Amino acid sequence: MKKALVIGVGPLNGLGAQLCKKIANNNFEVFVAGRTKDNLDIVVNSIIQDGNKAKSLVIDTTNEEHVKEMTKLVGSGLDFAVYNVGNNRPGKIIDMDASYFKESWETSCFGGFLFAKEVIKTFLKEKTTGTLIFTGASASLRGKSNFGAFNSAKGALRNLAQAIAKEY
């Protein structure tokens, strides 16, 4: 059975969870990854109730060691990977703490870099032609008032994804 890894999974009605369910319905064992174990367990249980396979992985996408460990836990056979992480919270630039802006960038873009690096290494090691997808937002294409941190982080992630596509 092929394996898929989806990172950035929150509530059952969110995009990450719905991607997991759709992928599982296409004969993948899905590794459901995110920050909140309770949310992950709900998604995993829903997938299992549908007669499919899934496991949860709690992860901090900005921690390189966590990301490396996550790909080890998935093991061989990874064929499909999705980075669906983002923190879309409004805030005016002049009112925004630097720590908030940095967290937004680290979560959306830096975490995407760490994830892609480990997934690509896995694909190359196994000599597979796996698929790596980054979910985006219209925020990656244009700035929007009160969303400067999210806009800039998603724009950077889009550029990273384009660079990766040209390299591999």
Regions found by a protein language model. Give the residues of each.
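Amphipathic alpha-helical dimer-interface segment in Rossmann-like NAD(P)H-dependent oxidoreductases
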Residues: 75-76, 107-126, 166
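Catalytic Tyr-X3-Lys loop
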Residues: 87, 94-113, 133, 157
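Canonical Rossmann dinucleotide-binding motif of NAD(H)/NADP(H)-dependent dehydrogenases/reductases
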Residues: 1-30
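Conserved glycine-rich Rossmann-like NAD(P)H-binding loop of the short-chain dehydrogenase/reductase
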Residues: 28-42
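Catalytic loop of short-chain dehydrogenase/reductase
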Residues: 8-10, 131-156, 161-162, 166
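Active-site loop of short-chain dehydrogenase/reductase
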Residues: 2, 77-78, 123-136
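Rossmann-fold cofactor-recognition segment
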Residues: 47-64
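Rossmann-fold scaffold of SDR-type NAD(P)-dependent oxidoreductases
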Residues: 7, 78-86, 108, 134
